Amino acid sequence: KTMSSVRVHPEVLSALAEQRPVVGLESAVITHGLPKEPRPELLQQLGDPFATKSHLPVHLALAEVMEESVRESGAIPATTAVIEGELVVGLTDAERHELAHHPSAIKAAPHRLSTMIATKATGGTTVGGALTLLHRGHPDLKVLATGGIGGVHRGWINRPDISADLTVLSRTPLMCVCAGAKIVLDAVATFEALETLGIPVLGCGCRSFPRFHAPGDGTLPIHCCTPPEAARIAQTQWKIGSAGVLITQSPPPPWALELETLETVTQKSVASVTASGPDATPALLGALDQASSGRALLANLALLRHNAVLASVLAAEHLQPLHHDL
């Protein structure tokens, strides 16, 4: 066993061996993306399964909801993380707890993985980190669910802050399910970068690039398709290249925000935040949560669960023999 090998949970390995669907999950959302204290009123507003966990800190409640939602949708969850320098696909309950309560968890982006292994560090994977672990962990892991991908930051002209989520997705043959790019990013620049990198962008039930907490406004058109069609397009994509496929859906209607309102609040938040680098996005999302009186956080949690369910459907579709005889 080499230092850089990936430990895959036995449950995940047996599901893959039996051709049962598996959904990969990132964990920076747990370590960096959400409040680490309980917000019982907020979680109760969302109803079950969040309401039953309203006593838990938000980040831990979400971690459990994601795994349970995948299971209820007929797939096996494989949460990725770096635990004491080990690359892990499929956390135990104890590891999930350790990760959520770790006092100095690192954001496990691709450029940090080797240092984290060498220093035996612990941290939550970004989309780019999760894609790397899933692809190295087992070639049949084909689906990752997240909230919103990283991309090109607002103000990129002054500081070219571009997430490795994009470059890693461009060379890793997985489906990544999201609600578009995080709202704190430049959606147009991110959309253009996806095209430049040769990453197909599909919409399940939507015709324009969703804006994370809000649906798209029609300005960034994407190919609208059903989950079986999306799985077939992904299969076709991997016959002609190694780029991943970005599969988007709008946030669920009762919780979605209106784009105009969201944009106004986001611009205020962006102006108020000075953090840069890996701390930028968590700080911006925190400011947005406050400025929107918690509505952005409600939408964020709802769309995360929504994406876990779609990812489970896609993981099952991917296994249908129909998609292999192209």
Language-model segments: residues:
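A C-terminal functional module that forms or caps the active site or interfaces directly
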Residues: 237, 243-306
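Short, ordered loop/turn segments at secondary-structure junctions
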Residues: 27-30, 82-85, 148-151, 179-182, ...
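N- or domain-start disorder-to-order transition segments that initiate the globular core
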Residues: 2-19
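Glycine-rich nucleotide/cofactor/substrate-binding loop typically near the N-terminus or early
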Residues: 27, 32, 40, 44-116, ...
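Anionic-ligand binding region
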Residues: 213-238
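Short coil/turn connectors at secondary-structure junctions
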Residues: 17-21, 25, 72-77, 111-113, ...
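Active-site glycine-rich loop that binds ribose-phosphate moieties when present
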Residues: 124-127, 156-170, 175-195, 226-232
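Divalent-metal (Mg2+/Mn2+/Ca2+)-assisted nucleotide/phosphate chemistry catalytic cores
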Residues: 90-173
